[in-house]
Amino acid sequence: MKKTLKRILFSSLSLSMLLLLTGCVSVDKAGKPYGVIWNTLGVPMANLITYFAQHQGLGFGVAIIIVTVIVRVVILPLGLYQSWKASYQAEKMAYFKPLFEPINERLRNAKTQEEKLAAQTELMTAQRENGLSMFGGIGCLPLLIQMPFFSAIFFAARYTPGVSSATFLGLNLGQKSLTLTVIIAILYFVQSWLSMQGVPDEQRQQMKTMMYLMPIMMVFMSISLPASVALYWFIGGIFSIIQQLVTTYVLKPKLRRKVEEEYTKNPPKAYKANNARKDVTNSTKATESNQAIITSKKTNRNAGKQKRRG
């Protein structure tokens, strides 16, 4: 539930920041954008689009694709770093789940507000002592750096002179495109589906809402904007899938091994409650869970070795 809340908060934060940065670029009565983000990043991007479209004779559709690819390649390391931080924190939380289970059980079974508050405090203390944080993997700085680029290319794709009257593969870039909207929805659904791979079944059930939320959001935005913007989101969706593939099948396995090695060398300590109503049984369970983590990881590694030999 906490990871679901974290993802919802992260998505809400991303959307809020997108709207905030969109507000930084205003459009005057003549239909010309202005503002700090536009003057700093948007104008150079618009000039690049014009250069590829008119001076190189590639057309505005291809020009938008090229500039979008350039921008996404530039900020891809930031996106991967953000994914690395979030995945590292998630793997650590998964590793510590058996250790925190007795506390979570007390939290679920709490009958009074006092008991619930005590369990929550104990859980947060245990997480803090082991270097864990519910929001530690969000990484706001990389997102803050990326958002101006997203905002600038959004307006460059929409307001570069000549784009609204251009066509690309039979699509009028100045009008809405149902075809691109459907493709974008599929791309972002695939990206959301990939993010659920390798996730425990229990957590996967909690993430189902998020799997549909992003495609729905993209449909509503794409269907109300010109095809030039949808074309930018189409390329962005491809890059999102690439980033998610790297995260799911490259970063996560490496981080899982890294976490296992870290806590094999330095086994995590069981948290001891300091309150007066200390439950000896739960303390024993925590200690047993602490040992169970190491035993479970060793068993999984031995099983993997036997499979490879077979």
Curated annotation (Swiss-Prot):
Residues 266-310 are annotated as: Disordered. One of its GO terms (molecular function) is membrane insertase activity. CDD domains: 5TM_YidC_Alb3 (cd20070). Keywords: Cell membrane, Chaperone, Lipoprotein, Membrane, Palmitate, Protein transport, Signal, Transmembrane, Transmembrane helix, Transport. InterPro entries: YidC/ALB3/OXA1/COX18, YidC/Oxa/ALB_C, YidC/YidC1/YidC2_Firmicutes, YidC_ALB_C. Required for the insertion and/or proper folding and/or complex formation of integral membrane proteins into the membrane. Involved in integration of membrane proteins that insert both dependently and independently of the Sec translocase complex, as well as at least some lipoproteins. The keyword Transmembrane applies. GO terms for biological process: protein insertion into membrane; protein transport. A lipid is attached at residue 24 (N-palmitoyl cysteine). Belongs to the OXA1/ALB3/YidC family. Type 2 subfamily. It comes from Streptococcus agalactiae serotype V (strain ATCC BAA-611 / 2603 V/R). The lineage of its organism: Bacteria, Bacillati, Bacillota, Bacilli, Lactobacillales. HAMAP family: YidC_type2 (MF_01811). One of its GO terms (cellular component) is plasma membrane. It is found in: Cell membrane. This is Membrane protein insertase YidC 2. A lipid is attached at residue 24 (S-diacylglycerol cysteine). The chain crosses the membrane at residues 33-53, 58-78, 135-155, 180-200, 219-239. Residues 298-310 have a biased composition (Basic residues). The gene is yidC2.
